[in-house]
Amino acid sequence: MTARTTARARATAVSALLASSLLLVPLAGTAAAHPAAAPSPAASAPRAGGFDATALERALAEVPDGDVSAALIRVGGKGSWSGSAGVRDLRTGAPALPHARFRAGSTTKVVTAAVVLQLVAEKRVALDAPVSHYLPDLLPPSFTEPPTVRHLLTYTSGLRPGASLGSTTEEMYAHRFETLTPQEVVAASVAQGPAHDPGERQEYGNIHYTVLGMLIEAVTGDSYEHQAAVRVFRPLGMRHTGFPGGPDPRIHGPHHRAYADIGGRTTDVTEWNMSDRWAAGDMISTTADLERLVFGVFGGKVVPRALLDQMLTVPDVDGGTYGMALERFVIDGREIWGKTGSRPGYHTVLGATRDLSRTVVYSVNAKSAREDGFPLVQRFALPAFAS
């Protein structure tokens, strides 16, 4: 089983490394990290449908391990299967919750793209109009050729990464309760000038979708969060999906504790202000809701069918693997479109064939959730696309 991807795509779009040989050390400030006995995996009986349920069950049977504390998987399309394994809290050893809420990371971009494409269908936004038409004060004179809305959607805008609170999980952890606004992120980006001409090459990054969030607010006169709710979450019945609410560091409702390796110690990183990720990665969701999102996007419910072809077109540029929000893979000769998301302690994947004959969504709690994690995708997602 193979997946066509690039080293860059693996490093940026797939972000948790399976490291089962690692040993958990005591939680910072606690006496023990291991549950007394790992709960048995829970899985639904597979319905007929051409995927490797045995491999998925085997993957869950190995959870928890030295890196992964919990895993939730849903497979849909022609045949369905779901399973959960691991623990929701290393202190108590309580079993994982099949419907737990989690930080969905960059899968947020799929929602942002859907909202923008609805505005395009309403003729309130034009794909090939410069972003400065909607945000006239955004770009300084150094941008002699402003990127278009299409460039932002396809990660080809030439915008440089914006401000951040650190480049490693350990650096960011020290600032986890601080607030960095989207406006500050974007201001730091545009102050550097463009990295390249718009449309010259594709470089995945959050900055493109942070600007799109600002565009949505400028065009609608409404908050990004409310537009996402009324245009995507509510129509699709995503009742357990939303945004934390500004700098709120908590995940409200049932959820798993998240862990990362900070200074050589397994540390609880569940509470974390992620508001700087905003329209690029601040969403909280469940696997069932993300499955609804997949069916809603590919089924034409929240992305107009006339624009879905454009969403699923990879631009002919250097490094191109993404359409709008979603990345294209080929697995055993099948074209798959998907998106990963990672925040400290949380790694998420959603993927589907264009005809929805196969879908997969998973959420994994992993200490290495922000590292190159193609092995996790191989373990928890690729068996769903086995021929």
Go through each PLM region and give its residues:
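A generic alpha-helix surface/boundary motif
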Residues: T54, A113-A114, A129, T210, ...
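Residue-level preference for non-acidic, small/hydrophobic
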Residues: L60, K78, K109-T112, V116, ...
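Catalytic loop of the DD-peptidase/beta-lactamase superfamily, centered on the K-T-G motif
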Residues: T2-R4, G29-S84, T270-S387
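N-terminal carbohydrate-binding/catalytic regions of secreted carbohydrate-active enzymes
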Residues: L72-P95, R103, V110
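Short, surface-exposed loop or secondary-structure junction motifs
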Residues: S142-I336, T340, P344
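N-terminal low-complexity, Pro/Thr-rich disordered segments
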Residues: A9-R58, S167, E171-H175, P247-A260, ...
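Short active-site loop at a secondary-structure junction
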Residues: T92-R150, H196-G205, W278
